[in-house]
């Protein structure tokens, strides 16, 4: 395991990033496996996007400025982890309202601890874990037109496509999207009983939201935030499928 240092300033940021990247390159060359998140922090709306800045950091440990060549020795393999239920969903919705209503709002270390504990130990329902194709294979297959030299943005997009294409979607995902659209596009993959259960679940999560004195939960806003969290994986996967067919 290794520590990603945050809240650094100026030149310290570059030095820490280079040191971490060099460590990762050395570890991979020694035959070790490393796991790293695709972005800093958590996606609040379940739209998973790889940060190009992360790929730039990973490339710092190589002896070339060519992004593709710099990342090649790391043997990057995208991994998709799908939860039926996100135990932190109400905390994310709560944070969205606080950011909307409280100028300059920032989470405290205690908030981070609650989020981490809830994310680890909270109930997730069914969980799917899919190991995708290596980045080198995604590049060589040419499923998407690529211009050389590859930019970190193009590489991030390839990683995202592989992750999104292997999402496991659950009834709650389709139901959330249909509730937002007001049309039952995906009725064939869920039942009225499923829909009733999801509606009850969403309302129960809103009840868990706790705001500072003087603020009232905006139930409609919170409801939409929660529905979007569960709908976005469907949209991301559909977008990837459409791009693949094009």
Please state what every model-predicted region is.
Residues 1-13:
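Conserved nucleotide-cofactor-binding alpha/beta core module
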Residues 3, 35-37:
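Structural motif
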Residues 12-34, 43-246:
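Membrane-interfacial terminal anchoring regions of lipid-handling membrane enzymes
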Residues 6-7, 39-41:
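Glycine- and acidic
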């Amino acid at each position: 395991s290794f520590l990603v240092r945050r809240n650094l300033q100026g030149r310290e940021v570059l030095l820490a990033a280079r040191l971490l990247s060099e460590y990762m390159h050395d570890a991979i060359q020694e035959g070790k496996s490393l796991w790293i998140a695709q972005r800093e922090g958590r996606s609040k709306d379940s739209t998973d996007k790889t940060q190009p800045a992360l790929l730039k950091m990973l490339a710092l440990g190589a002896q070339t400025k060519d992004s593709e060549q710099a990342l090649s020795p790391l043997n990057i393999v995208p991994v998709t982890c799908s939860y039926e239920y996100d135990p932190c969903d109400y905390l994310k919705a709560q944070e969205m309202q606080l950011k909307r209503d409280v100028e300059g709002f920032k989470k405290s270390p205690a908030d981070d601890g609650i989020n981490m504990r809830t994310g680890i130990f909270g109930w997730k329902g069914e969980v799917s874990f899919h190991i995708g194709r290596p980045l080198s294979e995604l590049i060589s297959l040419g499923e998407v037109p690529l211009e050389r030299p590859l930019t970190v943005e193009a590489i991030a997009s390839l990683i995202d496509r592989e992750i999104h294409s292997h999402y496991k979607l659950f009834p709650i995902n389709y139901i959330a999207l249909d509730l937002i659209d007001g049309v039952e596009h995906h009725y064939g993959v869920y039942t009225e009983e499923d829909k009733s259960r999801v509606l009850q679940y969403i309302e129960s999560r809103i009840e868990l939201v706790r705001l500072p004195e003087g603020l009232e939960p905006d139930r409609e806003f919170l409801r939409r935030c929660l529905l979007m969290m569960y709908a976005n994986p469907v949209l991301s996967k559909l977008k990837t499928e459409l791009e693949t067919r094009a």
